């Protein structure tokens, strides 16, 4: 019986979506000689979380690491078309600098003030607005139950498909090998990961392995004997229009998890149910908009009472059940050459450039260089010590 041929690489990235492709690109940009293999079971990316998202990118976080990652990612995305051109082909991402608007009730104003102060201290352009100032800036908004809002005009949104394929094409141009396959087993020693076996029967040896499998990363971690509290959580996105006139709106978010933005002649958004059952479920509830989202958008912006939903689709959050923040780093307590970059809980697209850079620095240089992401490491999972955002969803 023929033994499967073992292929040798320096780095095997498990998951070739927006995070894994960012990792591959950033590694090869730093070490052109690196042998990088990316294993992706579905190159159509039909169920990839990023491609089913709204593409938002914003600095409105409270953890300094997330703010700093957003600042870097915004810079990358705004210049992406030219800097990530591959083989003479531009990499358009259709960036729209429409801004973000976070809204809070009166009892959460102090929290928002703290958040804004931290963001401003890190160089973010943030306007803290009273209800009257909100009404002056956005005349259609209902403010009677609001305490304040934070507006970041430099934020916006882009095309996630363009971002993913831009990273992938550039990584391939630099030498990355993409395999259409699935990792089904891992061979480990007490201190290191040694080999992975693919669904096709092929085997890959590597000096380092990166788990960038998104909503599937918890399952991948189990193959290595690692517990990673990242699970899939279904969410809905809706495209809706409104015949009533309304001023241009930024990306609007509030503490109920309502989130929507302009999209062409209409709007794209939804309202995430944090109590949604975990699991790989892509079924669509076609009544969700009318029952949940429409009342929320109509309450906040009364002209949207005439909103009509044209399409609803589902996607998955790679939800970190510990604290909602990503896990970025190596499993230093055991398999020191197994790296995780997963659990972004809805923030993966916007942080893909910075997270990919961070993992690449660990792989190539052995330490974070541009931005210290140590607090987002796996150690907090092992210690059951959450590192949460305050009032940011």
Residue map of PLM features:
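Flavin (FAD/FMN) cofactor-binding and adjacent substrate-gating region
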Residues: 79, 103-174, 179-180, 185-192
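Active-site substrate-recognition segment that forms the wall
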Residues: 25-30, 50, 55-58, 82-99, ...
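Glycine-rich FAD pyrophosphate-binding loop
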Residues: 28-50
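Dinucleotide-binding Rossmann-like beta1-alpha1 core, especially the glycine-rich loop
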Residues: 55-137, 257-259, 278, 297-298
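C-terminal catalytic lobe of FAD-dependent flavoproteins
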Residues: 298-393
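Beta1/beta-strand and adjacent pyrophosphate-binding region of the FAD-binding site
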Residues: 5-19, 37
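Core beta-strand elements of the Rossmann-like FAD/NAD(P) dinucleotide-binding domain
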Residues: 6-9, 198-208
């Amino acid at each position: 019986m023929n033994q499967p041929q073992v292929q040798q690489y320096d780095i095997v990235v498990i998951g070739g979506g927006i995070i894994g492709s960012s990792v591959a690109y950033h590694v090869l940009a730093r070490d052109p000689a690196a042998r990088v293999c990316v294993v992706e079971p579905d190159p159509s990316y039909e169920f990839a979380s990023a491609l089913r998202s709204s593409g938002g990118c914003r600095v409105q976080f409270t953890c300094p690491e997330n703010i700093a990652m957003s600042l870097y990612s915004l810079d990358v995305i705004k210049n992406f078309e030219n800097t990530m051109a591959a083989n003479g082909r531009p990499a358009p991402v259709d960036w729209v600098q429409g801004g973000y608007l976070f809204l809070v009730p009166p009892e959460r104003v102090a929290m928002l003030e703290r958040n804004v102060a931290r963001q401003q201290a890190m160089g973010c352009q943030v306007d803290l607005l009273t209800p009257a100032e909100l009404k002056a800036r956005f005349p259609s908004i209902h403010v009677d139950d609001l305490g304040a809002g934070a507006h970041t005009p430099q934020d916006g949104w882009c095309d996630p498909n363009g971002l993913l394929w831009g990273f992938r094409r550039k990584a391939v141009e630099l030498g990355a090998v993409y395999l259409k396959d699935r990792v089904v087993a891992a061979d480990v020693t007490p201190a290191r990961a040694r080999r992975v076996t693919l669904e096709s029967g092929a085997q890959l040896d590597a000096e380092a392995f990166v788990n960038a499998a998104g909503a599937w990363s918890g399952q991948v971690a189990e193959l290595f004997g690692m517990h990673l509290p990242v699970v899939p959580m279904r969410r809905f996105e809706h495209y809706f229009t409104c015949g009533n006139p309304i001023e241009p709106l930024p990306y609007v978010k509030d503490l109920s998890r309502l989130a929507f933005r302009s999209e062409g002649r209409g709007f794209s958004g939804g309202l995430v149910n944090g109590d949604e059952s975990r699991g790989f479920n892509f079924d669509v509830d076609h009544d969700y908009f009318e029952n949940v989202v429409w009342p929320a958008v109509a309450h906040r912006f009364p002209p949207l009472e005439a909103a009509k939903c044209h399409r609803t689709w589902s996607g998955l959050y790679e939800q970190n059940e510990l604290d909602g923040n990503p896990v970025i780093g190596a499993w230093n307590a055991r398999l020191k050459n197994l790296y995780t970059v997963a659990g972004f809980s809805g923030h993966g697209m916007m942080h893909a450039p910075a997270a990919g850079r961070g993992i690449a620095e660990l792989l190539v240089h052995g330490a974070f260089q541009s931005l210290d992401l140590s607090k987002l490491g796996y150690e907090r999972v092992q210690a059951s010590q959450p590192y949460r955002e305050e009032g940011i969803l």
